[in-house]
């Protein structure tokens, strides 16, 4: 699909490129049951668990009045692989930034299993 990427996902993609420069962010866009479109069932591995935690983190952020995590931009910086959320973020932006920052760090520490890329969600993620 060639729909424009929501702005926040553009920032999240850049965060992933900061912590995992050796991989394309697209490797994380369709992985396991939770990375990308999915969001049900049992995570297939540690990396998928990172995405489940990220999904739950966004759900928590939605409890902040008017906060829409997928569209919320925030201010952050990447310095030599270290991500910092900046102090000028409002409550929503700060929460979403931290969700993305923690997920990008989690991705960097989790093994990547090629067999879990683009799996059959219906069969594996009930």
Swiss-Prot record:
Cofactor note: Binds 1 Ca(2+) ion.
Catalytic reaction annotation: a 1,2-diacyl-sn-glycero-3-phosphocholine + H2O = a 1-acyl-sn-glycero-3-phosphocholine + a fatty acid + H(+)
Pfam families per UniProt: Phospholip_A2_1 (PF00068)
Keyword Disulfide bond: yes
Binding site for Ca(2+): 34, 36, 38, 55
InterPro entries membership: PLipase_A2 (IPR001211), PLipase_A2_Asp_AS (IPR033112), PLipase_A2_dom (IPR016090), PLipase_A2_dom_sf (IPR036444), PLipase_A2_His_AS (IPR033113)
Organ and tissue specificity: Expressed by the venom gland.
GO biological process entries: arachidonate secretion; fatty acid biosynthetic process; lipid catabolic process; phospholipid metabolic process; positive regulation of fibroblast proliferation
SUPFAM superfamilies named in the record: Phospholipase A2, PLA2
Keywords: Calcium, Disulfide bond, Hydrolase, Lipid degradation, Lipid metabolism, Metal-binding, Secreted
Active site: 54, 100
Cofactor(s), by name: Ca(2+)
Cellular-component GO terms for this entry: extracellular region
Disulfide bridge map: 18-78, 33-125, 35-51, 50-106, 57-99, 67-92, 85-97
PANTHER family listed in its UniProt record: PHOSPHOLIPASE A2, PHOSPHOLIPASE A2 FAMILY MEMBER
Function, as annotated: PLA2 catalyzes the calcium-dependent hydrolysis of the 2-acyl groups in 3-sn-phosphoglycerides.
Protein name listed in UniProt: Acidic phospholipase A2 3
Organism whose genome encodes this protein: Naja sagittifera
């Amino acid at each position: 699909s060639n729909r424009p990427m929501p702005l926040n996902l553009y920032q999240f993609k850049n965060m992933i490129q900061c912590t995992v420069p050796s991989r394309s962010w697209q490797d994380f866009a369709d992985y396991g049951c939770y990375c990308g479109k999915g969001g049900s069932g049992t995570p297939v591995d540690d990396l998928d668990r990172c995405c489940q935690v990220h999904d739950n983190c966004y759900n928590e952020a939605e409890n902040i009045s008017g906060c829409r995590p997928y569209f919320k931009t925030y201010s952050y910086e990447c310095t030599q692989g270290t991500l910092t959320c900046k102090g000028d973020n409002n409550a929503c932006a700060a929460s979403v930034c931290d969700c993305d920052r923690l997920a990008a760090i989690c991705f960097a520490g989790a093994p990547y299993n090629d067999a879990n890329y683009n799996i059959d969600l219906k069969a594996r993620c009930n």
